[in-house]
Swiss-Prot record:
Residues 232-270, 290-313 are annotated as: Disordered. The gene is norD. It comes from the Bacteria. Keywords: Virulence. Signal peptide: none annotated. It comes from Brucella melitensis biotype 1 (strain ATCC 23456 / CCUG 17765 / NCTC 10094 / 16M). This is Protein NorD. InterPro entries: NorD/CobT, VWF_A, vWFA_dom_sf. Pfam families: VWA. Residues 445-631 form the VWFA domain. SUPFAM superfamilies: vWA-like. Part of the operon norEFCBQD encoding nitric oxide reductase. Essential virulence factor, probably involved in the detoxification of nitric oxide (NO) produced in the macrophages during the innate response against infection. Residues 232-243, 258-270, 292-306 have a biased composition (Basic and acidic residues).
């Protein structure tokens, strides 16, 4: 009863009731649809609508919308962030949640419509004008054309779009706007009424060439996604530049330093006059190219970055000057003594240009260093090895019996009887009356390509990913040795296109034994996952094998990526192209992954039946031999 005496609490509750919910669009949480729940269905819809298989679906980030706010909104927020649907060449960015309508089915229909709209969205459209008014009008024109294209291509979407337009008209807020903004709003309502098949009595409007001062963009319509243009960037090379030493051998004279500074473009705009505001000095000091310790935490920086609408990344023009330089005296055991067996180059597919980048990746082939002791297996793993060997021994080819031979270890009774009958009938007998047996030839060659990137050093369910991969690899290698198939084992990791390291654990002509077990135990995490170059290199030798059937079995824990431009859709398209090249050479390719999110991208790389997902990491040693038996059979 005395709560009103708590002045701060009373004022706070009143303030919350007044402006607590000031969003432009109403929200109905009880009827919300989450993107994470229907992401796979939407991906299938997008492929069915003709969308590119390598385009991924991701949640859209809330961005600041600069439309005109009401008084309560300005008091509460000052700005409004909306998770607007967007699309670029590689990603469909959809709202993480849609609760716009008081009908769950309508919220779901909006997701389906957005996917169909984005499937036919023109990706080669010109950039929108800088002027806010012209940008709004151009966006409305693109939306009208794209809606017409989507309804013509997919007639089943037209009734859904009609219902959505009617629902948007009912939910779109009525706000006080300036005269020109009201005219743009009338144009938006006219397009919505046209989509809902409602009468529209709005008169045509002639808009000025440019928007006046104070004009603010219209409130975005959730039915019409936007297009995000991303500039194509070249691979960065700044990290490869040598460090400049300020006290290098042979100190520069004053004349040389002056000449170097005159030629350096970074010093060309220096002036003795200071015409800038002094508040800029602190910001300029942060951009000086010197090494400094980091004061902020990574978590704090990540939160600050999430609050930005756009994050621009820049490069330093050269490395910072080093005060001194020295070489570390590494102990002998820290030196990598493994010899390179080859340094080869392979092309890389650039989906933007629709062409290969010739000799773009350098692959360093080397043997794996052996470890002094083999991998230690517990009792359960040792029992699994024995069981897998027994299962694989059944797959070992038996001996085939050849009948009616000139020579052999036994008589072919059928051939003997047939020969005697021919002689008794006055004909000519045959000398091919023997049986001969010989072992059936193995007709399968397989290469196990194992991803040993840095992500395999992660721990899942109290076990390191690489340790489980080693155990699964050892179990499968024992089984393959038991059935007699020809097998090679390769590992791969990368660090830029100039350093893709592929190491040989076992070659085709090498028998499985303690040496191979020691090499498996010696595997250690590397860097990144340039999958396309590794697959091309592994297939080059596999395709040369004389066996009729060939299999490339890829074991990985994540999607392809590298520290340079090799990420996102570029990496997916190159890996998909590499998988197609593997199949074109008569080699079957199959991927096994422990990444629980792999179903979002592996179908695009290897096809619907070209991969297996082992969600439980602990079951990998059991699942991998079973997958191999299925493929080999």
């Amino acid at each position: 009863m005395l709560d009103f005496l708590e002045l701060e609490e009373t004022v706070g509750r009143a303030w919350h009731r007044l402006i607590g919910k000031t969003g432009s669009w109403p929200q109905y949480p009880d009827h919300a649809v989450q993107l994470v729940d229907i992401r796979q269905r939407l991906a299938i819809c997008f492929r069915g609508f003709g969308g590119d298989i390598a385009v991924q679906i991701a949640p859209a980030r809330a961005r600041t919308s600069t439309h005109r706010l009401g008084l309560r909104q300005r008091m509460a927020l000052g700005e409004e962030k909306l998770a607007q649907p967007l699309r670029d060449e590689a990603t469909l960015m959809l709202p993480p949640e849609i609760a716009l309508f008081p009908d769950r089915q309508l919220n779901y229909d909006l997701y389906v419509w957005l996917v169909g709209y984005m499937a036919v969205m023109p990706m080669d459209a010109d950039a929108l004008p800088e002027d806010a008014l012209r940008r709004d009008l151009a966006a409305l024109q693109i939306a009208e054309q794209t809606v017409e294209r989507a309804c013509r291509a997919f007639p089943g979407l037209k009734p859904r779009y009609k219902r959505l337009c009617a629902a948007i008209l009912a939910e779109r807020p009525k706000r006080p706007l300036h005269r020109l903004e009201q005219q743009v709003e009338a144009r938006i309502l006219s397009l919505l009424k046209q989509g809902a098949d409602l009468p529209d009595d709005a008169l045509p409007t002639i808009f000025p060439h440019r928007g006046p001062a104070g004009y603010l963009p219209a409130l975005p319509v959730p039915l019409w996604p936007g297009l995000m243009k991303r500039e194509e960037v070249a691979p960065r090379t700044g990290e490869d530049e040598p460090v400049r030493n300020s006290q290098s051998e042979g100190a520069e004279t004053g004349r040389q330093i002056a000449q170097r500074e005159r030629q350096d473009p970074r010093h060309a705009d220096r002036s003795p006059f200071i015409l800038n505001r002094f508040e800029k000095i602190l910001a300029m000091a942060e951009m000086v190219s010197v090494d400094r310790p980091s004061d902020g935490s990574d978590e704090q920086n990540a939160k600050s970055a999430d609050e930005l609408d756009d994050l621009t990344l820049g490069e330093r023009k050269g490395r910072p000057a080093a005060r001194f330089r020295f070489d570390l005296d590494l102990p002998p055991e820290a030196v990598d003594r493994s010899l390179l067996t080859a340094e080869l180059t392979y092309p890389e597919w650039d989906y933007r240009k629709g062409a290969y980048l010739p000799n773009h990746c350098a692959v360093l082939a080397a043997p794996v260093q052996e470890k002094e002791k083999p991998l230690e297996l517990d009792a359960a793993a040792q029992s699994l090895v024995r069981r897998v060997r027994r299962q694989f021994e059944i797959l070992r080819p038996g001996r085939e019996v050849l009948r009616a031979q000139l020579d052999g270890t036994d008589l072919d009774l059928d051939a003997v009887v047939r020969s005697r009958c021919d002689l008794a009938a006055g004909g000519q007998g045959s000398d091919r009356v023997h049986l001969m047996s010989r072992p059936q030839a193995n007709d399968l060659a397989v290469t196990l390509l194992v991803d040993v990137s840095l992500s395999t050093d992660a721990w899942v369910d109290n076990r390191r990913v690489l340790d489980v991969e080693k155990e699964a690899l050892l179990v499968l290698a024992n089984g393959i040795a038991a059935c007699g198939d020809r097998c090679s084992i390769l590992t791969f990791t990368s660090r830029r296109r100039s350093w893709v390291r592929v190491e040989t654990v076992k070659d085709f002509d090498e028998s499985f034994g303690p040496t191979v077990e020691h090499r498996i135990a010696a595997l250690k995490p590397g860097f990144y996952t340039r999958m396309g170059a590794a697959m091309r290199h592994a297939t080059a030798k596999l395709a040369e094998q004389p066996n009729r059937k060939k299999l490339l079995l890829l074991l990985t824990d994540g999607k392809p990526n590298d520290v340079d431009h090799y990420e996102g859709r570029f990496a997916l398209e190159d890996s998909r192209r590499a998988a197609g090249e593997v199949r074109a050479k008569g080699v079957n390719v199959f991927a096994v992954t422990v990444d629980r999110e792999a179903s979002a991208y592996l179908p695009a790389l290897f096809g619907r039946g070209g991969y297996a997902l082992v969600a439980n990491l602990a079951k990998l040693p059991v699942a991998l031999p079973a997958i191999y038996r299925m493929l080999a059979g």
